[in-house]
Amino acid sequence: MASTTPPDAPTASRALPDWIAAVVTFLSSGAVLVLEVVGLRLIAPYVGITLQTNTAIIGFALAAIAIGAWAGGAAADRTDPRRLIAPLLVAGGALVVAVLPLVRFAGELLTGAAAGNVLLLAAVAVVVPAALLSAVPPMVVALQLGSLAETGSVVGRLSGIGTLGGIVATFATGFLLVAVLPSSVILVGTGILVVLVGLALAVLLRRSAPGVTARLPVGLLVLAVAMPLLAAVAPTPCERETSYHCARVVADPERDSGRVLVLDTLRHSYVDLADPTYLEFEYVQAIASVTDATAPAGAPLSALHVGGGGATLPRYLAEVRPGTVSRVLEVDPGVVEVDEQELGLRTSPELEVSVGDARVALGSEPAGARDLVVGDAFGGLSVPWQLTTSEALELVDRTLADDGVYAVNLIDHPPLDFVRAELATLRSVFPEVLLLARAPVLAGEDGGNVVAVASRRPLPADSIAAAMADRGLAWQVAAGEELTAFVGDAGVLTDDFAPVDQLLTPYASAAG
């Protein structure tokens, strides 16, 4: 007898309960976005946070989503999805956990912001687990389709649920989880949750369709157990993970009271716990020399510090210029905690620390209130571009008194395009600009830290050079025609166009 069942009749016996289909789709999509957000933080200690690292993570995540969705849909046409969904969840969750040790082992070999390092680490961080998990939603869709008449509603509903999962995961991770949990905990927790859901689904499917679904391969179960163990023994660059950095404090073996603040892979600050007048880094000595030459000896200053680090200069000024009032703008509350707990920082009415974005805080500074603004927010791998532009420098200028001075630490390496562009930008705002650097840097043969000095008033170049010499600092001062030749045809950075990540030539071992 011919069948009377129409070809598009519902196949409800294959379908998952709607709520289970929704949970699986929501979770698999959300886990991919957690991986994307946390993946950027995982690779940052090795290659920095730049436009390139953001682009690489986002690009590889999108590629993995596309590949996974295509492959998952194709596989669902050839194989009963009930055989594949649970193994994919278990494998994908285990590999989410595996990302942690894989990035850390690979990062030991790929430190530095070279494009190849960025691309390789980004690929390790997201591609395989994101592709596996992205194969799950199209399989769930195929399983839930009962008839052609339902195609639009089923596909639309599950697509919306998957998108919602990604949105919730993105906001929850970026605004909540990274503020209260280390990246390692977020990643391992997400992976384990996905594995557990996969195991539970495998049990459910074996009970509901024993002749269709197979047992999970033993190797897959071993992988799920082994990955958290591998994550536990992987090398870590972090003594403490802050909102923006891997931070650690290293004792100076040659100076009992010396401490180095290391953020990610770079030495950012040196603090002598017993002697705040001891300045280890040359660029800090150069900025101190600027204050020696531009303000009467011992006279208190009103100073604003854009970037906190170890708060070396605020403590130095408080010691050598009693009565100095300093406000430190630091974006990372974790760095402030390290300063207070391990580097002996004590805040007071004379030394205030404000946590938040410096560009925003500059807008709230009273006009003409500061004798000195120190810029020390730029690292050797990445630059907060919003502090480099002419609009940002106009805020600095507004903050300064008529005879105030802006001294900013910059880091770059040949061809020094970023330094040249920032000097051009400074010259577009301030009538007086100097560059302090070692002779090979001024000749374009070497790189590292340099200090740019800007003001509305004439700057005493000879006095600054003498002050640096008195400290034994072999730096020179470039001014006038020499500075013009150094800047060349570099363009001015603006809020509309500031390609600092492309201009900067990083070098991983530069002291930040």
Residue ranges and their predicted role:
Residues 133-136, 279-283:
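Phosphate/oxyanion-binding active-site loops and adjacent basic polyanion-contact surfaces
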Residues 2, 35, 241, 279-282, ...:
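Short secondary-structure boundary/capping elements
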Residues 191-192, 388, 421-422, 465-468:
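Composition- and surface-driven signal marking solvent-exposed, interaction-prone regions
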Residues 2-240, 251-255, 265-268, 299-300, ...:
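Alpha-helical transmembrane segments of multi-pass membrane proteins
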Residues 209-270, 276-277, 293, 437-512:
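Soluble small-group transferase modules, centered on the S-adenosyl donor enzyme superfamily
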Residues 16, 276-280:
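Aromatic-acidic/polar surface patches that form glycan- and anion
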